[in-house]
């Protein structure tokens, strides 16, 4: 069972934490833990901790024991936090869209020997990955998702 450390417990983040907690230990960090649903607060596989995602030292300390990190923060916060996660040597899935060029972090990821899956949000993120895969296998002329 993996130890998944998740930063961000908004509407989508809470849903992801519940899904992940079905087979893993989830450590969920957010600044607004009072706003988190009772379903999260009472889940036996989710540990809820107050973490200020804008405080890099708190983020670094929070993810220290993580097997993998899920970043689920608003896009304007994501780039700086993603850089910190990479520099801590943690594999990460980022479900946020970031206005910055994520490829600027590629060298950091290589140097820290980590895998970064970025822009992997529910939609359009995951459908883009699905489309990309199928487009390598066959010619796609139309693609719709709902």
Give the ranges of each region predicted by the language model.
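Rossmann-fold NAD(P)-binding glycine/threonine-rich loop
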Residues: 95-118
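Rossmann-fold cofactor-recognition segment
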Residues: 43-55
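Helix N-cap at the beta1-alpha1 junction of Rossmann-like dinucleotide-binding domains, i.e.
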Residues: 32-35, 99
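Conserved N-terminal Rossmann-fold NAD(P)-binding element of oxidoreductases
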Residues: 4-8
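Conserved Rossmann-fold cofactor-binding substructure of NAD(P)-dependent oxidoreductases
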Residues: 52-65
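Conserved anion/nucleotide-ligand pocket segment
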Residues: 132-146
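N-terminal Rossmann-fold NAD(P) dinucleotide-binding loop
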Residues: 13-14
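Rossmann-fold NAD(P) dinucleotide-binding segment
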Residues: 61-63, 76-95
């Amino acid at each position: 069972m993996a130890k998944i450390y998740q930063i961000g417990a908004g509407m989508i983040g809470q849903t992801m934490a519940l899904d992940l907690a079905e087979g893993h230990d989830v450590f969920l960090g957010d600044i607004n833990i009072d706003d988190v649903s009772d379903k999260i607060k009472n889940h036996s596989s989710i540990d809820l901790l107050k973490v200020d995602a804008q405080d890099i030292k708190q983020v670094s300390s929070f993810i220290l024991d993580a097997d993998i990190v899920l970043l689920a923060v608003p896009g304007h916060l994501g780039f700086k936090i993603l850089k910190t996660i990479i520099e801590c040597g943690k594999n990460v899935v980022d479900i946020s869209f970031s206005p910055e060029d994520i490829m600027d972090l590629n060298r950091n990821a290589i140097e820290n020997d980590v895998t970064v899956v970025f822009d992997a949000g529910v939609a359009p993120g995951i459908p883009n990955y699905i489309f990309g895969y199928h487009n390598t296998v066959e010619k796609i002329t139309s693609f719709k998702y709902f």
